């Protein structure tokens, strides 16, 4: 594993396009950090973790590759869940107490997949527009954390769970994901990726074995989910 560090970069996912599987690209600040659906990732310089990991697996089917954000989210939860109860919000957010602790953006790049990961570690004051929806390890636990240790723990966990995904497929992780699925059994509203598609609201049956989200018995493969109708 090689770890490349920058003080400032446009995006660690862009940096990772030059990497090979196992490479990790870390930055203190991203001038254009991105989340899913063109959302901006906001992170205080020097307090959190923003990094990208180059993963093998781009040779898998598009449907299997689409499950990788869930795999990465599970790895983050397995690494950090000892500090607080954590949950996964389909398809790519890690929550604590309903607030966002980490976000994930996976992108295919040639023969590889790039997993961009943002984790709120020591930030305790957030911009007003996200303050009610964000949290951090420090805010949860009332103490600061060594960010390099957090990074090491997450990378070790990611190596394990991504390896299991490569060897046994997404279905082998389904039970672990179901145990941390925060949407299952709730009423949800899903804004689909297709702008012409109407939002879907209904009872959430949880994450299916193919990575889709089941809402009123119907599988949804891409979108942004929120609790409530």
What are these regions (language model features)?
Residues 34-36, 89, 147:
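Basic side chains
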Residues 1-82, 184:
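N-terminal lobe of the biotin/lipoate ligase/transferase fold
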Residues 21, 58-86, 96-229:
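Long, positively charged amphipathic alpha-helical accessory segments at protein N-termini or as interdomain linkers
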């Amino acid at each position: 594993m090689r770890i490349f560090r920058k003080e400032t970069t446009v995006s660690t996912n862009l940096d990772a396009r030059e990497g090979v599987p196992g490479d990790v690209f870390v930055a203190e600040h991203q001038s254009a950090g991105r989340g899913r659906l063109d959302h901006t990732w906001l992170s205080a310089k020097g307090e959190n973790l923003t990094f990208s990991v180059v993963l093998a697996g781009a040779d898998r089917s598009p449907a299997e590759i689409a499950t990788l954000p869930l795999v990465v989210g599970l790895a983050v939860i397995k690494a950090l869940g000892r500090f607080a109860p954590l949950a996964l919000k389909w398809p790519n957010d890690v929550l604590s107490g309903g607030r966002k602790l980490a976000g994930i953006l996976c992108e295919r790049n040639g023969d590889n997949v790039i997993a961009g990961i943002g984790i709120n570690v020591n930030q305790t004051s957030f911009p007003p527009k996200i303050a009610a929806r964000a949290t951090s390890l420090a805010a949860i636990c009332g103490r600061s954390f060594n960010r390099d240790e957090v990074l090491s723990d997450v990378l070790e966990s990611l190596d394990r769970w991504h390896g299991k995904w490569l060897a046994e497929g997404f279905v082998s992780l389904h039970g672990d994901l179901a145990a941390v699925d925060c949407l299952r059994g709730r009423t949800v509203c899903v804004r689909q990726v297709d702008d012409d598609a109407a939002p879907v609201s209904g009872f959430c049956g949880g994450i299916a074995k193919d990575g889709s989200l089941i809402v009123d018995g119907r599988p949804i493969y891409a979108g942004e989910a929120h609790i409530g109708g």
